[in-house]
Amino acid sequence: IFNFEGGCYAKVIDLTEEKEPDIYRAIRPGALLENVVFKKGTKEVDYFDSSITQNTRVSYPIDHIDNIQVPSYASNPKHIFFLTCDAFGVLPPVSKLTPGQAAYHFISGYTAKVAGTEAGITEPVPSFSACFGEPFMPLHPAVYAEMLSKKMREAGVSVWLVNTGWSGGPYGVGSRIKLKYTRAMISAILEGKLDDVDYETHPIFGLFMPKYCPGVPTELLDPMNTWLQKGAYVSKAIQLAHSFHINFDKFASQASEEIMKGGPLIDSHHSLNEHI
């Protein structure tokens, strides 16, 4: 069981059955498509046509996919996955978080806006939404973060940051991390195959990156290894780290020391050469 939803609202631009089999097969009577275009003279949807917008979507009920949990409840989770789409190519595809890091990244709620997600967006823009859902959180985000850390410890839950965004460079230079690799990482975690592997620490974000994951190219696991120019990677990583710091300033007064230590390791006085 991954999460509980009443259905799904998914992007369908460039959709193929090979890339997204569950979503593709869920598009049948009862599903609602938005902003899509039919192939001329047919009732067949052209998922590669973005003439109206890149933001083509489908809504479908939960029973349009297999492997659902009915009714929607379960015991404590063993793993929590924070999903982010880092369009700057900086964050690792998967990293294990300490309770402090989990709280920090939960409060930050980082992702990136890319072309096609909103009108006027042509370059990647960092986007932060506290607790990954700021409009729906009436209390200070630190309250929810402390609750998360407490429950993590009580239930022995592991928290992972999974980046489904870019590798080898930012949007427009690098490439999107393949879905099959993300699925391989999730499967490895659920099967306990990342419990005993060696980890290394990201020099700027302090994240714990596995050195090995079955089904995933080793060089992909450390994002710096996928960039042709290491200095360019470090520069972009420091830039993103500063965006995290600037965003977190408004929460710092109510965040514990443990949470504050869960953020990027660098500050504004660190030089580029220290990390190359």
Language model features: what each stretch is:
Residues 1-226, 232, 239, 243-246:
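Glycine-rich, often acidic-flanked micro-motifs
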Residues 174-176, 195, 267-276:
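Terminal-proximal interaction/regulatory segments of ATP-powered molecular machines
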Residues 192-196, 200, 257-258, 262-269:
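N-terminal leader/transition segments
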Residues 230, 237-260:
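C-terminal, well-folded lobe of enzymatic/effector domains
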